[in-house]
């Protein structure tokens, strides 16, 4: 692998960061794959931040918006993905306003309706269990899922005890 100077690494990263929003960890991982030294990686990242190529808040807003609208992810899954990308929690906690609550609930409702059509069972309990697991895997909150499935707390407690 070629040894990159700071300037070469910076030029490559400015080009790469210009194509889409990137975060510190993505840039760092890419430079590490190229065997760039940690000292150079840190300098390049600082220069990218100073130049406006990397902005964690801007990245976070775009990430939340894209995963929510395009992938139909729930808030829990988005938060976990941002944690994996090492975005500080105080940054993504302030960015949830990108998600309109009514639209969020509408997307969950449509996902559950669509999934319901693909599940072949006559048992309501089994159907609800499968829908709950599906929506939880997509990162939606249990209370929101239950609300869309019209499961009352009393009925739910009785079903799970059987």
Residue ranges and their predicted role:
Residues 1-162:
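An alpha-helical, amphipathic repeat domain used for nucleic-acid recognition
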């Amino acid at each position: 692998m070629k040894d990159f100077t700071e300037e070469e690494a910076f030029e490559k990263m400015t080009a790469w960061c210009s194509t889409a929003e990137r975060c510190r960890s993505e840039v760092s991982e890419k430079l590490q794959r190229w065997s760039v030294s940690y000292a150079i990686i840190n300098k390049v990242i600082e220069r990218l931040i100073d130049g406006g190529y990397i902005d964690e808040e801007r990245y976070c807003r775009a990430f939340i918006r894209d995963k929510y609208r395009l992938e139909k992810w729930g808030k829990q899954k988005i938060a976990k993905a941002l944690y994996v990308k090492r975005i500080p929690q105080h940054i993504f906690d302030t960015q949830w306003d990108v998600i309109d609550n009514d639209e969020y609930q509408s997307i969950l409702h449509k996902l559950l309706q669509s999934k319901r059509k693909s599940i072949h069972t006559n048992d309501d309990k089994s159907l609800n269990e499968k829908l709950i697991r599906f929506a939880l895997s997509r990162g939606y909150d249990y209370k929101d899922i239950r609300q869309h499935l019209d499961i009352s707390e009393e009925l739910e407690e009785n079903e799970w005890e059987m």
